[in-house]
């Protein structure tokens, strides 16, 4: 009995290894290794410089990080989409919204409402124009689907 209590095997465990401040989620590591979800900022910036707003709009909405829990990826995607939305001319907004299907309009509405949460200079006026056109095409159902959706952008 005395022999078991004097054992020092328990001292070989490095308790700093189990520090909760050093926690790393395996899913985030796998996502970072396989390429993060979200729009490609280089592709979107290139299309914006070329003046191809419609393709930049579709590229920004492609691969949206809805299923990820990484908030930094979601913020980066929100910034890219907001940059594209603010670069559109007022006369081109309706054509861009009409080029989307129902799921695309719902995704656009999610980004619009996310933009309303954290307004930047002049973004609210632009987002209101986008909201008006998206509401005309998607109807009230798109607002309800966005507000009741569990997966956010």
Swiss-Prot record:
Biological process terms in GO annotation: Arp2/3 complex-mediated actin nucleation; cell migration; regulation of actin filament polymerization
Gene3D superfamilies assigned: Actin-related protein 2/3 complex subunit 5
The reply on keyword Isomerase is no
Family of this protein = Belongs to the ARPC5 family.
Which residues are recorded with the post-translational modification Phosphoserine? 64
InterPro entries to which the protein is assigned, alphabetical: ARPC5, ARPC5_sf
Q: What is this protein called?
A: Actin-related protein 2/3 complex subunit 5-like protein
Do you know which SUPFAM superfamilies this protein is assigned to?
A: Arp2/3 complex 16 kDa subunit ARPC5
């Amino acid at each position: 009995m005395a022999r078991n209590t004097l054992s020092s095997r328990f001292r070989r465990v490095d308790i700093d290894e189990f520090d909760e401040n050093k926690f790393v989620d395996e899913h985030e590591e796998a996502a970072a290794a396989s390429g993060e979800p979200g729009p490609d900022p280089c592709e979107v910036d290139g299309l914006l410089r070329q003046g191809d707003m419609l393709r930049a709009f579709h590229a920004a909405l492609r691969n949206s990080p809805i299923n990820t829990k990484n908030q930094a990826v979601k913020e980066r995607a929100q910034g890219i989409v907001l940059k594209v939305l603010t670069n559109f001319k007022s006369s081109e907004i309706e054509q861009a919204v009409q080029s989307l299907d129902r799921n695309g309009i719902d995704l656009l509405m999610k980004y619009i409402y996310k933009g309303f949460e954290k307004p930047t200079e002049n973004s609210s006026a632009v987002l209101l124009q986008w909201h008006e056109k998206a509401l005309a095409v998607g109807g009230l159902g798109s607002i309800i689907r966005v507000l009741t959706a569990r997966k956010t952008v």
